[in-house]
Regions:
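Long, leucine- and charge-enriched amphipathic alpha-helices
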Residues: 4-45
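Short, glycine-rich nucleotide/cofactor-binding loops
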Residues: 50-61, 134-135
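Histidine-anchored nucleotide/phosphate-binding helix
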Residues: 61-79
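Short internal beta-strands
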Residues: 77-83, 158-161
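Glycine-rich loop at the start of a catalytic domain that most often binds anionic cofactors/ligands
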Residues: 89-98
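A glycine-rich helix N-cap at a beta->alpha junction
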Residues: 97-135, 139
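A short aromatic-anchored loop/beta-hairpin motif
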Residues: 145-153, 158
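Glycine-rich, aromatic-bearing surface loops/beta-hairpins
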Residues: 159, 164, 172-175, 179-199
């Protein structure tokens, strides 16, 4: 076999090897692209979901601070208020049509953000009043201002239907424009969220 023939044979073999390798690489690339599509479909969205269980001023306040901060950063934010957290959403107290236990709960629970106490050092409401004075002096937005800001920024606010039923809270007692939903509503939001918090 002459040198020319050897060179031609080598070139043909290299061409076959290169074609096989290119074909194998193309298949691997297709598989990787398919996996990437699948993974990107499973990634959480740019959103945060919070359960607001507490009805304490010093816990509801951070919920609204986080929600407005997230909304300002372009994230979708949702707050799911349940049990004692529902007190923050009350605009009035309505005893009509309620049973004895529901009336007792209604009388013992605060109405609205103004009535929320502190989780520590509340001292029959004095602690909460002092906290509000300090916040005003330090030019920190009040809970009421943050709640209004959150609504204006499109933060989704949901009241837990089951908790409303248990505590005897009527839809008419809560802020206008909020949603009422069950645990499925929260779970649907949380499943798509980057962050989920329990406050």
């Amino acid at each position: 076999m002459s040198m020319v023939e050897k060179h031609q044979t080598t070139t043909v073999l290299q061409g076959e090897i290169t074609a096989e390798r290119v074909s194998a690489l193309e298949k691997r690339l297709e598989n990787l692209e398919e996996q990437l599509k699948q993974i990107s479909g499973e990634l959480p969205e740019n959103r945060i979901s919070m359960i607001v269980f507490s009805g304490d001023l010093d816990k509801v306040l951070p919920a609204f601070i986080i929600a407005t901060g997230a909304a300002a950063m372009g994230m979708e934010a949702s707050l799911f208020f349940t049990f004692w957290g529902l007190n923050a959403l009350k605009k009035r107290r309505d005893l009509s049509g309620k049973g004895f236990l529901e009336k007792m709960f209604a009388m013992m629970m605060p109405v609205g953000t103004e009535g929320l106490g502190l989780s520590k050092m509340n001292f029959f409401g004095i602690g909460a009043k002092l906290m509000r004075v300090l916040m005003k002096r330090k030019q920190v937005a009040s809970l009421e201002e943050l709640a209004q800001m959150a609504r204006e920024m499109g933060v989704k606010i949901v009241a837990c239907q089951m908790s409303m039923d248990v505590l005897g809270i009527k839809r008419e007692e809560l802020w206008d424009g909020i949603e009422v939903g069950g645990v499925a509503t929260f779970l649907a939001e949380a499943a798509k969220s980057k962050l989920t918090l329990f406050i």
